UniProtKB/Swiss-Prot annotation:
It comes from Acidithiobacillus ferrooxidans (strain ATCC 23270 / DSM 14882 / CIP 104768 / NCIMB 8455) (Ferrobacillus ferrooxidans (strain ATCC 23270)). The keyword Lipid metabolism does not apply. Keywords: Methylation, Ribonucleoprotein, Ribosomal protein, RNA-binding, rRNA-binding. Part of the 50S ribosomal subunit. Forms a cluster with proteins L14 and L19. This is Large ribosomal subunit protein uL3. One of the primary rRNA binding proteins, it binds directly near the 3'-end of the 23S rRNA, where it nucleates assembly of the 50S subunit. One of its GO terms (biological process) is translation. Methylated by PrmB. The modification N5-methylglutamine is found at Q151. GO terms for molecular function: rRNA binding; structural constituent of ribosome.
Amino acid sequence: MVMGLIGRKVGMTRIVAGDGRVLPVTVIHVAPNTVAQVKDIATDGYCAVQVATGTRRPQRVTSALAGHFRKNGIAPGRLLREFRVADTANYACGMDIDLDIFAEGQRVDVSGVSKGKGFAGAIKRHNFRSNRASHGNSLSHRAPGSIGCRQTPGRVFKGKKMAGHLGAEQVTTLNLELVRIDANRRLLMIKGAVPGARDGDVMIRPAVRG
């Protein structure tokens, strides 16, 4: 895997491309990303770069995390994320990762926490078809139907699609087009929708299937 950036979702808008097409884009603001730790095979068993973004008041940082930042000589960050890399030779603690690691027209993968929907039924959560509206149906219009068999196996299998908590989980959208980069305002404009609500944190990486 290769390096990426941590950003914050601003919202969606539309822009006019050079060929006249009107494109729906998600705007992501990328605050300065600073290398907080470099991991290699000798010490950690794998190669990765830990990145910090944003700022946090010292009194809001736990002792363990404050020691981690102090050891590596950087100011406490609001958020820590890790990116796997093939080689860590080009990275050092304290260096900034800028928007120039991406280029306009490049394909990217965006990861974020999806919007939480709370407790949802099987129809909304798993896209089940609703039951018949009439003709003998009583109070089972949105019921999931049968969830098992009989005495054998005598249980409901794990993973059965049923009602439960919907959303608020890590989601990655693949192969999105990075339409425009505004370096002055530190904005990335990505075609289409990305996971999460406004002001949610997202991770942007070069596409693995691009």
